[in-house]
Structure formats: C-alpha cells, structure tokens
Amino acid sequence: MAKEKTVYVCSNCGQESPKWVGKCPSCGEWNTYVEEIVRKETTNRRPVSGIETQKAKPVILSEIEADDEPRINMHDDELNRVLGGGLVPGSLVLIGGEPGIGKSTLVMQTILRMPDKKILYVSGEESARQLKLRADRLSEVSSDCLIVCETSLEQIYVHIKNTSPDLVIIDSIQTISTENIESSPGSIAQVRECSASILRFAKETHTPVLLIGHINKEGSIAGPKVLEHIVDTVLQFEGDQHYMYRILRSIKNRFGSTAELGIYEMRQDGLRQVSNPSELLLSQDHEGMSGVAIASAIEGVRPFLIETQALVSSAVYGNPQRSATGFDIRRMNMLLAVLEKRVGFKLAQKDVFLNIAGGLKVNDPAIDLAVISAILSSNMDAAVEPEVCMAGEIGLS
C-alpha cells in the first residue's frame, strides 16, 4: 500500500519544501513553487526497468581494469569534438535547445549515419509517419534504426528489453512519465524520477542514452537543476531561427572538455558541418564601407574571424540611443566612455548601433579593439582596410 504526501517544488531549481513559499530560499525566484503529490512505497518495489542486472560488489581499487574503452563514433566530426572524441558507452547525454532550433534534426541525421549500430528512437512528440517524413527530407536512411512512439517509461523499458539496442534516443524527456509519480508529464517530479531511472539503466546495462530536452524562457534546461546534475553530459544547441548557423556547445562533460563547440549550417536537407566558420560569418561586399571591422575571436578553443558592424548618427529624438546585437550593451557603453574620456571623441550626442554579423553572440573581450574601430570608422565615415584583422582588449586606463 502506498502512502501519499504533498510537497512543493521550485520549478526553477528543484528545491523542495513541505509548504508553499513565495520566494525560493535556494535560487531567490518568486512564485516558482508548484504542488506535487509523491507516493512513498511501504514495501520494496522492483526496479522500473525490469531488466535483470548484476548487483554491485565492493572491489579493490588497484584491481580494477582501467583500459581505455573505445568511444562510439557518431559519424559527425562536430558532435564527436564536443563529446570529447565520441560517445562513451553507458553515458547519459542531454541535448537542450529552443523549440524548432534543430535538436531532433541533429540527432536524426546523426543516427541515420550509423549503419553499424542498432538504435532505438523513442519519440513522445512526433508520430512514426512524421519521423519518416523527416528522415526522407534528410535523404539518409538506416535499416537498423527502430522507431517507437511511447511516453510511458515502463513501456519504453519493455521495448528496450525486446530489441537490445546499442543506443537509445528519447525525444523528449519532458514527455516521459512513470507510474510511480502521480503528476503530469513534464512536471518537476516526473522529469527528475524518469531521468534518475534512465541513468541507472544506462550504467547497469552499459547502454548509452541520448535525451532531448527543452529550455525555459531564461535559456536554461527546462525542469529542475538536478536534471543537469544527474546526466553525464549537457549539450546546448544554440542559434537564431532567423539565421542559418547553429552552435553546439558543451556545458557539462564528465568525459571531455567543455571548451569545445561545434558549428552547423541549417539547410533544407538538414544540418551541414562547418569546418571553417569564418567563411560563414564574413561577408564579401564590405570593401570600402565605413563602420565595418574584422576581429579575431575565440569561442571555446576554436579561433575564427567575425565581422563587427557599427552605425553612428546624430541623435534626433532627444536622448541618444545605444543598441548592441550579439555584444554586451554594458561593455559597449564602457568602451564609449573610454573613447570620450581617454581619446577625446565626443559621442554623447550620437546614436550608436552595434551588430555582430551572422547573429553570433560573442563574449570574448579580444574584440574590443574591433568594436571601437568600427564605431570610429562610422563616426568619421572612413573605411577600415579589409586586410586588417584586429584583436585586443580595452581597459579603463
């Protein structure tokens, strides 16, 4: 017989409380506590997976064989780079991103390139027919890719037991629910319980699992922060839907570096790997145009060239406007203050607009020199030589 109890869980960080509170004491957010009903079993229950596994036994550390196990080749150079050289067997990987950014497309075209692996694709958002249409659009078909549309965690384990796949894809974790939790799919308790169960399955059976997750309005993975702590690797798929490029960034990686990133170009037939991102980010028609400067920046450990565009004009509507796209507006205001105080350029009564071409968001301070060069170029209406590439941080002194 199961006992029920009511708890309140913060939808932002996963902090639990026996009663509702207005402000979360853990993350400081307001009105984020939601009611959850949790059943506590009075008897020992069987594992949700129902898959027979060996019980763990203590072993001597020096007797453990630590041979490097070969990683699974994903047949995608950018994805392999971000994962740290490939997918580690028995690992749990979470891929997050905005709706429609291309997460399912990235995973689908990757698994279709793996004919040597038996893959089970579990979809909780699309039907089998919709997945077939997506695969046809990608022009790649694998005979060893199995599709199942299911949202029950218990039934997913049944399909895994019957098929014995080499790799499991779950799209998405917010649609999966377990019978042990009396709450709707996507709730804090469901996401946490399902993720913890899937992690135990991956470790016990040595089967890698890829989870696809959504992000909330703050840009973090939807669900409790404990979800990011549960999984082995967290990959963020970023980009603007109005631009054709996408960036795959590693936020957490227990088996590799978090400094790597992969760049893709969105096309009608799927995502194309971009080995030289400078070709994608630089335009070819800016020669002789004022307000344009080329900068050398580093994202992760990959250096590439970006185009910095600026427009300076007289303020017409009273207070001058300051706008920056892809660059920190506060840092731009600091650079404008340095120009006025240290160099003597009077920009207090000018509108200043800054844009990083391609929609890229850059935090590298090495592009400061290119930013002020583009601003001065636009203010003086004098073009910067197209062969000049700039890199340098600007200080207050």
Can you describe what each PLM-predicted range is?
Residues E126, T151-S152:
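Short beta->alpha linker loops
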